[in-house]
């Protein structure tokens, strides 16, 4: 997907109150940008490092700027987690995720049990595949990892996928790594051991795991290639 308008370069000053980032534009002006990321962004907030912003002319928005990309060790990292589902929808429409090809149609934000899963794919014969998408930005050593903070919501989604499998459907947890500099993924057991254990249980009960990395530039971002993974 291409960004609708060219991104604006800036420099990171600070992130605070979870959804706010102060940055300095090229002309020296300091602005506050919306940070559409509920995680900790561990290892990604480097004072003075380049970042890239999108701008909205919508007068109803409280903040015109949104933090889209940061730099980590020279690599671009997509920190707008709200894009992950849009990236997957685009990839599904373009058949760029082979294990999720061949479906007649899909729905988004589908209620299931007491949760809501990101996608429900319907095969031509009617079989259902439920997919939950997780945006990954964390780098631990040379591996992509999830989560970057304790996530009770993530465990709830895994429980819904486990239930879907037991009900005779297909359940898939799809990790979208919004960076292109890493080749392997693992659960971040040192950050959230409960989630790592729940993920292993889910896989042992038939939930499928897919991990795909993105290709990123300051003009576009798209789902590009599968990554290897370990669960231990």
From Swiss-Prot:
A GO MF label: DNA binding
Stored InterPro entries: SfsA, SfsA_C, SfsA_N
Pfam families: SfsA, SfsA_N
PANTHER family per UniProt: SUGAR FERMENTATION STIMULATION PROTEIN A
Similarity field: Belongs to the SfsA family.
Protein name as it appears in the record: Sugar fermentation stimulation protein homolog
Annotated source species: Magnetococcus marinus (strain ATCC BAA-1437 / JCM 17883 / MC-1)
């Amino acid at each position: 997907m291409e960004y609708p308008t060219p991104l604006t370069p800036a420099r990171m000053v600070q992130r605070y109150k979870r959804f706010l980032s102060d940055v300095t534009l090229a002309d020296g002006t300091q602005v506050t940008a919306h940070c559409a990321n509920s995680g900790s962004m561990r290892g990604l907030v480097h004072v003075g490092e380049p970042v890239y912003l999108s701008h909205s002319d919508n007068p109803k928005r409280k903040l015109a700027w949104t933090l889209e990309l940061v730099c980590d060790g020279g690599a671009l990292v997509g920190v707008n987690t709200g894009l992950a589902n849009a990236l997957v929808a685009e990839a599904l429409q373009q058949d760029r995720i082979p294990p999720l090809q061949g479906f007649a149609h899909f729905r988004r934000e589908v209620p299931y049990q007491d949760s809501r899963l990101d996608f429900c794919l319907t095969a031509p014969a009617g079989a259902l595949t439920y997919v939950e998408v997780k945006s990954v930005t964390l780098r631990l050593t040379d591996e992509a990892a999830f989560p970057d903070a304790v996530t009770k919501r993530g465990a709830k989604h895994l429980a819904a996928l486990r239930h879907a499998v037991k009900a005779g459907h297909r359940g898939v947890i799809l990790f979208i790594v919004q960076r292109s500099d890493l080749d392997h993924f693992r659960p971040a057991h040192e950050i959230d051991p409960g989630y790592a254990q729940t993920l292993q249980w889910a896989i042992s009960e038939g939930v499928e795991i897919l991990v795909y990395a993105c290709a990123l530039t300051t003009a576009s971002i798209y789902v590009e290639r599968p990554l290897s993974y370990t669960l231990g």
